[in-house]
């Protein structure tokens, strides 16, 4: 018998024999077990199959051999076995000196480079993981040294690499030899040598184990199990016969095949039989030794296979194919000492062997190592194992079963058929110790271990205690030796605790779990058990995280410029701000670059509802159409029967839970049906300020009125065993009954009256009922609130209610049809209570209205997506991994992905957006922006210079000590005083802690020509409270923690917390006492301290009034407007209410009629001020704080804007200007910014320009700190 190559296989049998130039012979494939092909798999993973051939032997010269083929079931030698006229390889000739290296790697079909790379990558992985650096390694496995050449690592990392490789070699050697070994690793440049591989008698086994490990690496690198590896036999296996050996080992290397015929005895057969008889007749005179040897040999191998000798020659896999499921096939004969394992496989050929009639040197091998053979195939035994599977346990669910080929790590032990095996693993994960799963039996102890491709993922599951493995032996050798294959049938069970109640899922909106914990290896279990989802998710994390995945987004110039700016900044190529003035951008263009502006001219237009009293512009009709379509979704019945797009459905073996649903992003599993009802409907209307977002929303409310449905938003699920018809009923029955509300609009307090007025103005009478839920007379009846079509409230009221009752607050007990967040950037920080309160609201549709969805950093958008319930992006782990971090690192995928997410969710138009005809969508009067540079008087300059020098000395000390950022608050305090000094020195002289600035008193007297009043000291017990009071006196009033607005009638608690008196008393259940909402301290009403309201200034500012340079320039502008007689109205913005106090003095003296609007005004006071300013002609000036007037207000009655002091964030100033330059404005808007020359204000403009060039969120924490330090140094130049 022989195996031929492809060319010969295409010939006929006779032609093949006649054309066999290299003296190859041909034999037939026998008929055996369904006439399937046979293959032999060695312990190294190499599989060899016989091919069809003639039934006659051909000698080396091409003539017919005198010896005919062996009959059926005849076995030839313990090296090769001929069964059914097929040549197979026995395990007794394991490759004991397998050389895997570039010279000895004989690979066909052009796969040599792949295999060499696979071997080298295996070693590179060990070296790289230990050193943390990349390395270039050339591997050659020889006996007895392991050479690793061209090791490119840093010298200081060498010791760690040596230890890692030494541990790896120790493990291989110890596993192969069964005993501990002492390995010495010597690093020689450029080679890494491993010496002293245990004792000499174990060298062959160790070399074989190392070689097998490399073969396993090669096998894993290909798509099929068999590999193109040349297997060389031991050059000389012959050793002297030891007296106590059962089998003499005098077999020498042969180049011939010796075949013995059972039916026709020959000289060869006679010689073989004589040799066998001599073997068993030798020993003591009484024959006991021979008898004992024969009994031991018979017990060593089961009866049924007859052995002969076949000397091996090199075998090579030439044409590997994808293999079928392994099957073990019986060999039946009367007697045998050799057993082989055979498996069906596609056509594979090996090199031919030669025939010889010489038998003088043919003898039995001492090291005969059998491979297991059973009388029934695996399929039959698998059925028996399934029938006798493990008993059902209450809380454990059977997922599936699989055949696993394990490896033995023990000698001389025996496994019974269907014997139960137990699995163990290390309870502590260590980077030096791989994940190993060992198996044992109660009878024999440890037997072996699972392959690493199973252990790597199984250990993490087993450690959780929620997954367990139970196994039985299917096929194993009768007596085990090292590194033999054992076939196990393993069952996998999962505990019921692994299932998540979807309504209580930890994958919450706005949650921030550890990303690694969300990547659950349960998916790996399904993969190895070949369990595929019968209902797949719409998209997977792999698709999102793949570098090959294309989002089909066009790269625009702005995006590339932004990424280039990041790269330059990371490389230290940042140029000075003065050299880059031409790169300065407006906040509007900055916003457009990051989030983009929609091509809205392709949108259809929708006519306004008849109940709307105003006319909509074309772009507003487009917005109405887009919002209406966004609110349309699948109906309730379909949603209750539709699987959520982030979940997949799998079928398992356990009848109690035939289906498991797995969240592919969080890894959570459930046996309940996750419905699609949570999917949000709505989006972000991000039109630039002044385009009429309020009117568009009112048109939507009138066009699509509705009431909430309890089942629409709650994350509830139906029983998995319910059919589709009952799923909706069960789903609704599980839902908590809530009142059905209309539209909830949440806005800042300053916009409450404006929303109410707009709703009443733009809708016909009795069309909608509006409730303003604000103030002390609020009702707590959910049904009464829900009865109104529109409910208006503030972020402060919502947050206060949420803090008290969390998800059971008055707003959370209503299922709203629609929720609208006006000025939605208010919740840009997703960790705040205000943001969390909005996340927990229940509604059918959700809308965010904001002209600045991105203010400071990319993370601002994340909070909006959390409110909209856009999965999986409402989870911080995935947002951070796939968007935030790539964006920070300059990876364009981060920016592309956020654009892809926002494209269907956001509609954004700017004042520069054009329609189909190329015209601007909104024609507004132009703006005239000027910067007025003020020159300080001599007294002001001296005062400022002294203050600056003192501040700079303190700042330089912080820099020298390296504690700048540790004293960041103190430095901001220094900058605050410098900025206030630019407005008016009185603001600095209002400080009560005069000791720090005592040396400035002489300069103050020069400016005021009067000494400041002294400040009395309070009792020490009230010192800390007085510090808090002083913040309020200085104009640095903090917002009330309950309503999130500037404190109105502020009070101090004994625990030194400041808030509105009304907000605090309203939060108490009793009128006389309650808890502090901050620290939960018990408070009494009599203990509350009213904050001082007397003048904050240390001097009598009215009596000692003197105009500063900035105030003088402002008065000149106002006088000019007054003299013109045009009736123009002006708004003066400042961020300090104390400066507004000072401005009142010269305005009164010069006869100007003015009003004031700041955070201290209550809601009714604000309504009165705005109404009077818009309707009366006498009040031409409005003093307004930048914070209170920067959002949402419609101030088109004014046409002149005065910005008295620069703000850190230019977007805040832009918002204030847009209150005037918007729809309804009919005059040119004049904007005047006041800057004092050669002061910190001038440098603040440069800092503003720097911030505008920085892409939000594009810096690491370290770079943020470095940027802050550079900005501070710029300000103190």
From Swiss-Prot:
Keywords linked to the UniProt accession: ATP-binding, Chromatin regulator, DNA damage, DNA repair, Helicase, Hydrolase, Metal-binding, Nucleotide-binding, Nucleus, Zinc, Zinc-finger
Zinc finger region(s), RING-type: 1040-1080
EC number: 3.6.4.-
CC annotations in GO: chloroplast envelope; nucleus
Region (Disordered): 271-293
Residue ranges annotated as motif DEAH box: 822-825
Disulfide-linked positions: none
SUPFAM superfamilies tied to this protein: P-loop containing nucleoside triphosphate hydrolases, RING/U-box
A Pfam family this chain is assigned to: Helicase_C
Residues annotated as domain Helicase ATP-binding: 674-871
Family: Belongs to the SNF2/RAD54 helicase family. RAD16 subfamily.
Function: Possesses intrinsic ATP-dependent nucleosome-remodeling activity. This activity may be required for DNA repair. Does not seem to be required for DNA repair and regulation of homologous recombination (HR).
Protein name: DNA repair protein RAD5B
Name of the coding gene: RAD5B
